[in-house]
């Protein structure tokens, strides 16, 4: 198989192309598969991303750095990068896995990408692997907010309301639908001060709460600026009223 186009997309040329070929080989294809390279690449990825975050975000504490890193190295993030690199076209799969659509499976694509990182490390050393990882991740980091990346909707809503000194939302299950083994929960989220009342649904109470929180957060982002603007206008009006000096002519007329 020709790997020239993939090497161009990676921006790295292998001195041992067989390493790249192995990185793209699933265990269903033959014995020289990519699982050991994946194991190695996983560690390289975590180290390189940690180094990158440490240098880029000097104000984030250890907990936030760990949260951001976990979000960047999880399967979904790797899958999206693998899609961008057109890895589905390059995978070597066994016949059964190929027929079942393995080239579209997120886990297989994520594993192959980690294996590529491991292959680059063996071929060119840690600096080469780190350079590749930075090339792939810097554009992603430029588009995300590290303060919120990886936080769920309930957490984001709570932090947003606390930041504006608004009482926390209330959640209540208002309905359940379906058979016991396949229930759908409907949860209502209310924020009295903002007059927000929205509902979300999900296969579990937690999922339904997250769905409702996401909708409530969207509403809060729309309403809170209006509330702040109105509050400032009211304070400005009171200040002006208090600062207005008495009219001496009016005082004379009142005395008469």
From Swiss-Prot:
Active site positions, chain numbering: 42, 114
SUPFAM superfamilies given in the database record: dsRNA-binding domain-like, RNase III domain-like
Subcellular location, record wording: Cytoplasm
Reactions the enzyme catalyzes: Endonucleolytic cleavage to 5'-phosphomonoester
Listed InterPro entries: dsRBD_dom (IPR014720), RNase_III (IPR011907), RNase_III_dom (IPR000999), RNase_III_sf (IPR036389)
Gene Ontology BP terms: mRNA processing; regulation of gene expression; rRNA processing; tRNA processing
Disordered, as annotated region: 227-256
UniProt similarity note: Belongs to the ribonuclease III family.
Subunit structure: Homodimer.
Name the record gives this protein: Ribonuclease 3
Species annotation: Ralstonia nicotianae (strain ATCC BAA-1114 / GMI1000) (Ralstonia solanacearum)
Gene responsible for this protein: rnc
């Amino acid at each position: 198989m020709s790997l020239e186009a993939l090497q161009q997309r990676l921006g790295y040329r292998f001195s041992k192309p067989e390493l790249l070929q192995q990185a793209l080989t699933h265990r269903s294809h033959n014995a020289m598969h990519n699982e050991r390279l994946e194991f190695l690449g996983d560690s390289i990825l975590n180290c390189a991303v940690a180094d990158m975050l440490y240098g880029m975000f000097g104000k984030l504490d250890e907990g936030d750095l760990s949260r951001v890193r976990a979000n960047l190295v999880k399967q979904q993030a790797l899958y999206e990068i693998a899609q961008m690199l057109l890895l589905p076209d390059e995978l070597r799969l066994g016949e059964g896995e190929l027929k079942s659509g393995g080239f579209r499976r997120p886990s297989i694509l994520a594993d192959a990408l980690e294996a590529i990182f491991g292959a680059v490390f063996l071929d060119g050393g840690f600096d080469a692997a780190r350079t590749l990882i930075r090339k792939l991740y810097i554009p992603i980091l430029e588009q995300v907010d590290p303060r919120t990346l990886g936080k769920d909707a309930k957490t984001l809503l709570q932090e947003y309301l606390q930041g504006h000194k608004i009482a926390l939302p209330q959640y209540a299950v208002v309905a359940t639908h379906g058979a016991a083994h396949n229930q759908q929960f409907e949860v209502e989220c209310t924020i009295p001060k903002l007059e927000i009342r929205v509902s979300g649904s999900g296969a579990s109470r937690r999922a339904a709460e997250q769905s409702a929180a996401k909708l409530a957060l969207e509403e809060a982002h729309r309403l809170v600026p209006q509330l702040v603007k109105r509050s400032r206008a009211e304070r400005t009006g009171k200040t002006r009223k208090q600062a207005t000096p008495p009219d001496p002519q009016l005082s004379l007329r009142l005395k008469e």
